[in-house]
Amino acid sequence: MSVVLLVRHAQASFLEPNYDKLSKLGEAQTHLLGEYWVRHKIVFDRACTGPRVRQRDTLSIASDACRKAGVPFPGPLVLPEFDEYQGEAVLEKSLPGLLTTDQSIRDLHSAFESSSGSAERRATFSKLFEAVIGKWVRGTTCPPGVETWLEFCSRVNSGLTKFLSAGSRGERVAIVTSGGPIAVAMQRALQLSAESTLNVSWMSRNSSWSEFIYSGERFTLSSFNCHAHIDDGAMLTYR
């Protein structure tokens, strides 16, 4: 049996012009993750990451903390299969049409547009984003040029099969990715519905990990959304 840790990237720059960049808090979160691996003597045989800067930098900072402490860390692969779904594109291309046909979306959009202050803007945007993504998952909105939910799930599952099958028995591997791919892994392990999978995706905290046991076709959940490396509750974030 082998073990894979799927790690969600640390906090990115939410509602900033360039989201795909770790915040200062995100950098601190992932440094703590690396230190946790060192303290608990967690050593990986292989590692990979999705292609996004926030994913690659999360692994880079954590692995640097390991190496500085004298703990070996494998050079990572970068696999596009572990990219997040195209949430920004779904929102951008779906919103104009939904604003003309869906009162609930109009209300959520109006609440976001009239919000002020960082906390309120985060909360109102999250509600709008989750509502639009929910429609995409259910197939209510299918913007052209954007992969469907089923295509996204197929991509992630293909990546899991490719990366995990390339190893050997008894190894421990790490995959740094995003909340969506981690939820697809949960779906794979627990046979979740699309709606439940989406709900799970909102639960992953930044820099948390979920552990799975695998061998051949067997893929079993061991733990979900662990963040034992963070003691300060103020450092726990979803976005």
Which positions does each model-derived feature cover?
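Active-site metal-binding loops of divalent metal-dependent hydrolases
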Residues: 10, 179-180, 225-227
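Conserved beta-strand termini and adjacent loop/short-helix elements that scaffold enzyme active sites
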Residues: 7, 79-81, 224
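Beta-strand elements within well-structured catalytic alpha/beta cores of enzymes
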Residues: 3-7, 48, 171-177
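Phosphate-coordination/substrate-recognition cap region in phosphate-metabolizing enzymes
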Residues: 35-125
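Acidic, low-complexity terminal tails and accessory targeting/binding regions
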Residues: 2, 68, 85-106, 112, ...
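Short, well-ordered beta-to-alpha junction loops that form the rim of enzyme active sites
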Residues: 51-52, 81, 173-180
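Hydrophobic, aromatic-enriched interface-forming segments
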Residues: 116-167, 177
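Loop-to-helix element that buttresses phosphate recognition and phosphoryl-transfer chemistry
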Residues: 3, 10-64, 76, 148-155
